[in-house]
């Protein structure tokens, strides 16, 4: 989403977004921490996974267009029966697989080109441009500068772009790390989708 907003010229890395109670029609998202931070930069909003700024950006980009961009890159969104992409999409309103998520995040290390994961080395490589090379560079720099989610200020020799997530109801905790050579995704959850209270992407999957 942030890369698409960068490509559209809607924001740059230090543009200010408002993290405060807002209504988007009849939708009023809150943050995971149940608090708000006021004006925040795009970089901070992305690093901290702030919900309200993300919904604001999705409203400007358009949820249907955003979903189409993801599907074109191999992320086959699973929506509730009869539902069309809406603003809840960016907060877990649609599902995907870990493999598809990793393929999309690989674009950050591949100049904006997503690659469908292959299970066999001789399988054909399927690539799709998801974002511009410039947007991929900026988003990767933002996620690298945030550090590892559970220890954001620890020094490390490896530059890793980290992103984590926790689904509504604690059904899924996930993390993706991107380097020049590897893109690794981790999912923690139960096959039947029952909750794991206290399981967060940053402290469980990362």
Stretch-by-stretch model annotation:
Residues 1-3:
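Active/ligand-binding-proximal structured segments within catalytic/core domains
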Residues 7-66, 110, 114, 124-145:
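Conserved catalytic neighborhood of penicillin-recognizing serine enzymes
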Residues 14, 78-89, 115-119, 150-155:
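Surface-exposed patches in mature extracellular/periplasmic domains of secreted proteins
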Residues 16, 44, 56-58, 68-69, ...:
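Structural recognition of the beta-strand scaffold that forms the well-ordered cores
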Residues 28-33, 62-103:
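Mid-domain, small-residue-enriched loop/turn segments at the edges of structured enzyme/sensor domains
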Residues 44, 97-206:
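A penicillin-recognizing enzyme superfamily signal
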Residues 51-52, 85-89, 193-197:
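Glycine- and acidic
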């Amino acid at each position: 989403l942030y890369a698409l907003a960068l490509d559209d010229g809607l924001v740059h890395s230090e543009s200010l977004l408002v993290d405060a109670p807002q209504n988007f029609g009849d939708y009023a998202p809150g943050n995971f921490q149940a608090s708000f931070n006021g004006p925040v930069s795009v970089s901070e909003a992305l690093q901290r996974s702030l919900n309200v700024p993300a919904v604001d950006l999705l409203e400007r980009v358009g949820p249907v267009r955003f979903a189409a961009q993801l599907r074109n890159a191999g992320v086959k969104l699973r929506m509730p029966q009869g539902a069309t992409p809406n603003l809840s999409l960016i907060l877990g309103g649609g599902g995907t697989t870990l493999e598809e998520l990793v393929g999309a995040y690989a674009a950050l290390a591949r100049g904006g080109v997503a690659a469908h994961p292959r299970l066999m080395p001789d399988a054909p490589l399927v690539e799709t441009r998801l974002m511009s090379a410039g947007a991929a560079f900026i988003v990767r720099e933002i996620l690298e500068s945030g550090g590892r989610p559970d220890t954001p200020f620890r020094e490390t020799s490896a530059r890793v772009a980290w992103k984590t997530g926790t689904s509504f109801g604690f059904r899924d905790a996930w993390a993706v790390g991107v380097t020049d050579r590897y893109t690794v995704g981790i999912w923690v959850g139960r096959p039947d989708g029952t909750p794991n209270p206290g399981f967060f992407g940053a402290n469980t999957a990362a």
